[in-house]
């Protein structure tokens, strides 16, 4: 809201919000992750879709899904360890979005979060819940120091959390630009984190510095009298949303009251069918021919 009050664009506000989420919801969102962004320019009647999803390191091969004996690793096992981490695209995407649609100066977007990280923010209830899991901070000394007390118990909800390292990182990016996050040595810490322990990553500094943000054609389809546009693959959420909406449109006589068993049943079945399709047909279009338009036709 502060960005809009200062004359900024919706993109300025979105970037400032993302930076703040990296502080107060760091378990779910941050500079080490990936982002999709869709932007509608009402004046130009133009829709832009940017893909900043985390991607596999350049050295990745299919053999990384197998164990030392050649057997297929369990799906749950592949989701743990440094090998499961993708090359982050959030910051490159934010920089590209700002270059295209931002109005305020880049450093201005960082001020609220730098201030909150330096002065402290109250421990959110959801972060507390996540950190309370038995293995949440195991072997992570930095997390223990930041979010836990001397008895290694999660600090109570509402406790003031100060994160000077995040503030320092944001100050560097604000003053020197997005590439500063890797130029100032953060890449060393990031790579050390994903290259140690269980199933280490093959990620390199070159992967981090050469991340390619892609502009993709949005995926659009009809819903009643509307035209709904969503993020195209590799995002699978858009395909699911359009499929569900179009199946519901065929049953529009049922209304939209979730308290009615008939509608609730149709909605649940539509979701099941859409999820089945996305699991079977939707993947990274760089490696797999995705029949996206056919799926929402």
Language model features with spans:
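Noncatalytic scaffold domains of N-terminal-nucleophile
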Residues: 2-6, 10-183, 188-232, 236, ...
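Short helix-capping/linker segments at secondary-structure and domain boundaries
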Residues: 99-104, 175-178, 248-255, 278-282
């Amino acid at each position: 809201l502060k960005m809009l009050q200062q004359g900024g664009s919706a993109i300025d506000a979105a970037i400032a919000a993302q930076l703040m989420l990296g502080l107060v919801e760091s378990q779910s969102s941050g500079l080490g992750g990936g982002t999709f962004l869709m932007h509608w320019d009402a004046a130009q009647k133009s829709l832009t879709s940017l893909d900043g999803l985390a991607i596999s390191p350049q050295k990745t091969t299919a053999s990384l899904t197998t164990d030392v004996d050649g057997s297929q690793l369990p799906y749950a096992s592949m989701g743990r360890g440094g090998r499961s981490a993708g090359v982050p695209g959030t910051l490159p995407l934010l920089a590209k979005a700002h270059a295209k649609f931002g109005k305020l100066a880049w450093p201005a977007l960082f001020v609220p979060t730098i201030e909150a990280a330096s002065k402290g923010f109250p421990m959110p209830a959801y972060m507390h819940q996540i950190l309370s899991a038995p293995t949440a901070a195991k072997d992570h000394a930095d997390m223990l120091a930041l979010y836990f007390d001397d008895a290694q118990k999660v600090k109570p909800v509402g406790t003031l959390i100060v994160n000077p390292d995040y503030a320092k990182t944001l100050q560097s990016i604000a003053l020197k630009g997005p590439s500063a996050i890797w130029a100032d040595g953060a890449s060393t810490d990031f790579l050390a984190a994903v290259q140690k322990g269980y199933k280490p990553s093959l990620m390199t500094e070159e992967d981090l510095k050469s991340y390619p943000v892609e502009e993709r054609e949005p995926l659009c389809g009809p819903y009643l009298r509307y035209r709904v546009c969503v993020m195209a693959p590799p995002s699978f959420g858009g395909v699911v949303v359009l499929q569900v909406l179009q199946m519901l449109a065929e049953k529009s006589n049922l209304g939209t009251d979730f308290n009615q068993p008939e509608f609730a049943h149709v909605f649940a079945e539509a979701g099941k069918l859409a999820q089945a399709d996305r699991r079977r047909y939707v993947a990274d279009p760089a490696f797999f021919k995705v029949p996206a338009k056919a799926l929402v036709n």
